[in-house]
C-alpha cells in the first residue's frame, strides 16, 4: 500500500518540473508561482493518504489483536470446563457430594413444615380479621366517620377563610384609587378577570 502512492507521485511531479524551462520566458514567471501553489495542495493530499493508510492498517491490526483474544478466550476455558464435567471425580471425593436433594419422597411434608414455621404466632385475644375489610372501620380509634386528618367539615371553613384573607389584602389596595391612581384597579382587574373581588372594590370605594 505504501509503494503504490509514491509511484503515482513520481510520474505526477516529473512532467511538472520540466514544464518550467519548456514554457517561454514570458510565461515562466506566471507559471512558476502557480506550480508551487499547485504542488502544495497535492503534497498534503498524498500525505493524508499516506497517514490514512497506516491508520487503517493499525485499526485492522488492532482489530485482529482484539479479535484474536476474543476468539481464544472462549475457546481455551470452555474445553477444559467441558472436559472437567465429563471426567470422573477422583477417589477422595464422594460421588454424590454435589447432587441436589431429592424432593420427590418428602414433597408432601416439607412445604407444610416450612409454612408452619414461617407463620407468625397469633394472639388468642384477637378475633376475626382485624385490619382487613369493613371491620377496620370499627377498630379505628378516631371513629368510623372521622379521619386522622380531621373532620371533613373543616374543609369548607378553610375555603371560606381564603376569600376573607384576599379581601383583607385588597383593602389597602382600595385606598390607592381614592388618591387618584386609577391604573391599579385596572391592572388588578386584568390579573383576576373572573374573580368577584374587583367588583367588591368598586362597591366599597363608592
From Swiss-Prot:
Disulfide bonds: none annotated. Residues 1-19, 33-76, 148-194 have a biased composition (Low complexity). Residues 126-142 have a biased composition (Polar residues). Residues 1-206 are annotated as: Disordered. This is Prion-like-(Q/N-rich) domain-bearing protein 96. The lineage of its organism: Eukaryota, Metazoa, Ecdysozoa, Nematoda, Chromadorea. The gene is pqn-96.
